[in-house]
Amino acid sequence: MKEYNYTIILEKEDDGGYHAFCPALSGCHTQVDNYDEAIENIKDAIKLYIESLKSHNEDVPEEDIAIKLIKVVL
């Protein structure tokens, strides 16, 4: 088994739910009611995404994202 590491983004929705997505895997996302469920669901979505790529003999993208928190003062 190969281990994959990906950055995920979790956004709180106006209705209180969460949208989670993996920028390195285009279209890989989930929307659920709570934070913990978002993390579990995006892990499952990533696994399914990678399995689909492999079953179609496609390359699995490498993580190529840099995240930096910046301060903007007005």
How does the language model describe each region?
Residues 1-5, 11, 29:
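A detector of short terminal or domain-flanking linear segments
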Residues 1-6, 40-74:
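Short, charged, surface-exposed hinge/linker loops at domain edges
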Residues 10-25:
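Short aromatic-glycine-(Arg/Gly/Cys) micro-motifs in beta-strand/loop hairpins
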Residues 21, 39-40:
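Short, surface-exposed helix/turn micro-motifs that flank interaction/cofactor sites
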Residues 26-35:
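A short, exposed loop/beta-hairpin motif centered on an aromatic-Gly-Thr core
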